Amino acid sequence: MKLCGFEAGLDKPFFLIAGPCVIESRDMAFETAGALKEICVELGIPFIYKSSYDKANRSSGKSYRGMGMEKGLEILADVKKQLGVPVLTDVHAIDEIPAVAAAVDVLQTPAFLCRQTDFIHAVAASGRPVNIKKGQFLAPGDMKNVVDKAREANGGADTIMVCERGASFGYNNLVSDMRSLAIMRETGCPVVFDATHSVQLPGGQGTASGGQREFVPVLARAAVAVGIAGLFMESHPDPAKALSDGPNAWPLPKMKALLATLKEIDALVKAHGFMEMAG
């Protein structure tokens, strides 16, 4: 799959989608995008900047949602233009899709909306690549139905990615089944692993989600060892002060060291192929 000027697939080095959960300010957007770009250029990792203009599915109605679509898209467009990095953001409603698709390079669908047929059709028909997150309630094999819906709308174009972000495991907990990464390959789409939302404890703090940030490297290493096309990680300069999803965000100052390790694992695994795909 051609994505933002590079090739994405299991036979290529992994790409990174990273940035803060939500746009907190213009300055922080540029700070994080610039730092992540510098790291990825040094390590030779294809990079897409991610941040949200609105978090429509916060645990509490009193939680910070973002800067809003107009201001948020303006900031993302400026990051793209001034720093020369492709940008991704999530879209939550059909009527927002045209404006979002005009401003960013890649659209992302929230996991909760993966079964909404009209929404998937509309996002897929936007003309932009789409990262479809697997719902926490969905079996990995069921993502084929979601992808089929998307391909109905985009004429079968090679513009769809699928993303694993953990499965509900009782109340306020998620678990990552690494088999799902191999199973989701059967969609024919590049598979992305979300290493930060996978350690989330949904609603675990009552009015907000908790998280187990210390396990981000554990799951990231495991996913890269399984074999993935891309890695998604939310990162923040100071996660304790993040306005959204701080408990599961990976600290920006620690990003380079983790990515360097993951790059070595990725190269080793992909150099030897995948026995499970041998037939």
Curated annotation (Swiss-Prot):
Pfam families to which the protein is assigned, alphabetical: DAHP_synth_1 (PF00793)
Signal peptide: none
Pathway it works in: Carbohydrate biosynthesis; 3-deoxy-D-manno-octulosonate biosynthesis; 3-deoxy-D-manno-octulosonate from D-ribulose 5-phosphate: step 2/3; Bacterial outer membrane biogenesis; lipopolysaccharide biosynthesis
Any one of the GO CC terms: cytoplasm
Enzyme's top EC category: transferase
Highest rank taxon of the organism: Bacteria
Keyword Cytoplasm: yes
Biological processes, Gene Ontology terms: keto-3-deoxy-D-manno-octulosonic acid biosynthetic process
Enzyme Commission number(s): 2.5.1.55
GO MF: 3-deoxy-8-phosphooctulonate synthase activity
Catalysis: reaction(s): D-arabinose 5-phosphate + phosphoenolpyruvate + H2O = 3-deoxy-alpha-D-manno-2-octulosonate-8-phosphate + phosphate
Record key words, sorted: Cytoplasm, Lipopolysaccharide biosynthesis, Transferase
Compartmental location: Cytoplasm
Family to which the UniProt record says this protein belongs: Belongs to the KdsA family.
Protein name, per record: 2-dehydro-3-deoxyphosphooctonate aldolase
Lineage: Bacteria, Pseudomonadati, Pseudomonadota, Betaproteobacteria, Rhodocyclales
